[in-house]
């Protein structure tokens, strides 16, 4: 079993191809390079995954939102997506 790696591929091309299902994973060289197209595509359902750790780590793709903390107005969708991705990785061993 091997890993097929392609690239480098321009960001304006690779992210659309990844969203269309041409790739299982798209790796960005730095934080903002990866977050911009993902957040534009689907802000609420974007999830960060740290690969290469000895445990599963997912997180929401937004900040802490201290300005709305405790007001009962936060949207839960990002957190639910992060949990669903983590559960899928643990139970199936693959990304959803």
Q: For the regions a protein language model found, what residue spans apply to each?
A:
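Glycine-rich phosphate/nucleotide-binding loop
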Residues: 1-96
């Amino acid at each position: 079993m091997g890993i097929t790696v392609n690239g480098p591929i321009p960001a304006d091309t690779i992210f659309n191809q990844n969203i269309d299902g041409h790739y299982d994973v798209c790796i960005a060289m730095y934080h903002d390079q990866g977050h911009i197209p993902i957040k534009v595509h689907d802000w609420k359902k974007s999830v960060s995954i740290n690969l290469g750790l000895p445990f599963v780590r997912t997180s929401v793709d937004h900040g802490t939102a201290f300005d709305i903390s405790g007001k009962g107005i936060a949207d839960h969708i990002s957190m639910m997506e992060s949990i669903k991705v983590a559960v899928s990785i643990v139970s199936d061993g693959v990304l959803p």
